[in-house]
Design a protein with these regions (language model features):
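Signal for well-folded cores of large energy- and translation-related assemblies
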Residues: 93, 97, 180, 198-201
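Catalytic core of nucleotidyl cyclases, primarily class III adenylyl/guanylyl cyclases
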Residues: 100-131, 149-190
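Acidic, glycine-rich loop-and-strand cores that form catalytic or ligand-binding grooves
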Residues: 137-144
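Conserved NTP-handling cores and scaffolds of large molecular machines
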Residues: 146, 150, 201-204
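Catalytic/regulatory signature loops of cyclic-dinucleotide turnover enzymes
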Residues: 170-172, 192-214
Length: 214
């Protein structure tokens, strides 16, 4: 079953209107942030890990990012970039939520999400084939939502040129570790499959995505 585009449009529009009302209330200064959305990778809680911990787990990894976002931001300015991101990220996160993905990182205009892992296998029987399928369907529906939600709102609100995105999906083992210092730390995942998904998200042709199942 595919996502309900109308519901995602409604949710994205409501979120956008809240952001827009804040622009009206006060001057806006754009700050570039690349913080993790949480300190938890499925099955690995930060407060239960030691600094320098080393654990391996298998995940389907999805990377999605916006094409030519730096140039676009320069062309439309800080305020419209702010509003665009509230449309763009909200819509894509709704798709990930629909397919029960776990958002691991939001890096500027890029999103990394995981499916699978030990916890998902035990609780949801999400074996490799199911994890890859969910990640792949998520990527497919992101393309539809980009066209029917994101770009429709951008055009309607005169927020600049249409958005193009790239998506890559892989499956393999990743290393999970707790990194940082007390009171300032994060749980991070590293692995070739993450690098490959990121690479394909930046190189795949428009209106397509690449799935590499290892």
């Amino acid at each position: 079953m595919a996502v309900d585009v109308d519901e995602i449009y409604k949710s994205t529009w409501e979120h956008y209107q809240k952001a827009k009302s804040n622009v009206i209330k006060k001057d806006f200064v754009l700050e570039h942030r690349a913080d993790a959305i949480s300190d938890i990778i499925p099955g690995f809680e930060a407060d239960k890990l030691e600094f320098g911990s080393y654990d391996k787990e298998n995940f389907a990894v999805l990377f999605v990012d916006m094409r030519d976002s730096t140039l676009r931001a320069q062309n439309v300015g800080a305020e419209k970039t702010f509003l665009t991101m509230h449309v763009y990220l909200t819509a894509l996160l709704e798709v990930i939520k629909f397919y029960h993905g776990k958002v691991i990182d939001i890096m500027g205009d890029g999103i990394m999400a995981f499916w699978g892992g030990r916890a998902a296998r035990e609780e949801e029987n999400m074996v490799k084939a199911i994890a890859v399928k969910k990640a792949g369907l998520c990527g497919r529906d992101m393309l539809a939502v980009r066209e029917k939600v994101i770009n429709e709102i951008i055009d309607k609100e005169d927020l600049g040129a249409p958005i193009n995105i790239g998506i890559g999906v892989t499956f393999d083992s990743v290393i999970v570790t707790k990194i940082g210092i007390p009171n300032s730390y994060d749980v991070k995942a590293f692995g070739d499959c993450i690098n490959v998904a990121s690479k394909y998200s930046s190189k795949v042709s428009l209106d397509n995505f690449v799935i590499v199942s290892i």
